[in-house]
Design a protein with these regions (language model features):
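The two-metal-ion catalytic cores of nucleic-acid processing enzymes
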Residues: 1-273
């Protein structure tokens, strides 16, 4: 750590999208309290469109009354790394983050997939918030009037990591040995969260797990096979009991569990990988 660096107020753990579609949520681990503070700030970044000047002017007029668009501004800039001089650019701000890609595709179609080049479409609002504010995950930060400022550059290699709290997490099926394939209707008999092991019938056990995780508020749940078994089985049994994502909350934000990518099987020289 730079000896001259300012003492941080905390560490930026992450920036996520807000459910309202117009903001991002900043998660900061406070230095003084050790707790994680959630703060939402409005942030709707534009994506950029380049093309012939007259086509950009026509596009700006067409987008002015489009309900999917919050704002359109003409600028001069160098959106590409290969641009040696500024050129006309149209900055398009989607009304909601979820409309970003569909709006970009519609604009591309208006140009016959030839006239326009689009930039920053594939970057999410949290990614662009990091870039625009000089932030990065786990950055030590100070809060200056609601603006987070990193006290160390992203290129720093000698720095103190945030003091993350870790809790061991394990799910056990009643009457089954861990590691074996459970029966389709296997009931959860016990769940370990940190130093606490919870047991009992599922309709009491699963709400107790939510309560214990909220009480302990760990930054990391450390499990062996969590992605392949623990979490999917927990959510499966919660759904069987009628506990939706608004009631069965294992994180700091109520979100539904979904696979990051669909399951697939690959064959290579007769072996299933």
């Amino acid at each position: 750590m730079d000896a001259g660096a300012e003492t941080p107020d905390g560490w930026l753990l992450d920036v996520t999208e807000s459910p309202d579609g117009r903001s991002v949520v900043r998660w900061v681990k406070e230095r003084a309290s050790g707790r994680v503070r959630r703060s939402a700030v409005e942030y709707r970044p534009p994506f950029l469109v380049t093309g012939p000047r007259e086509r950009l002017a026509d596009l700006a007029r067409r987008l002015a009354d489009d309900p999917r668009v919050a704002a359109v501004a003409r600028r001069s800039g160098r959106p590409s790394l290969y641009d040696r001089r500024p050129r006309p650019v149209l900055a398009v701000v989607p009304a909601r983050h979820a409309a970003r890609r569909t709006l970009a595709r519609a604009i591309d179609a208006l140009g016959g997939f030839v006239d326009f080049s689009l930039y920053d479409v594939d970057l999410t609002a949290p990614q662009l918030y990091h870039f625009d504010h000089g932030l990065y995950p786990f950055a030590p930060v100070v809060d200056r009037g609601g603006t987070l400022v990193a006290t160390e550059p992203a290129e720093a290699i000698d720095y103190a990591p945030p003091p993350l709290s870790v809790a061991r997490f394990e799910v056990r099926i009643a009457g089954e040995r861990r590691g074996r394939i459970p029966p389709p209707d296997g009931r959860i008999g016990a769940v370990t969260v940190g130093d606490v092991t919870l047991e009992g019938p599922e309709d009491d056990l699963l709400p107790a797990v939510v309560t214990e995780i909220a009480r302990a508020d760990p930054d990391i749940l450390l499990s062996d096979g969590g992605d392949s078994f623990d979490l999917p089985w927990l959510y499966r049994r919660a759904a069987a009991l009628g506990l939706g994502p608004d009631r069965f909350v294992l994180g700091r934000e109520a979100v539904a569990l979904r696979a990051a990518r669909p399951a697939s099987t690959f064959e290579s020289y007769g072996r299933i990988l």
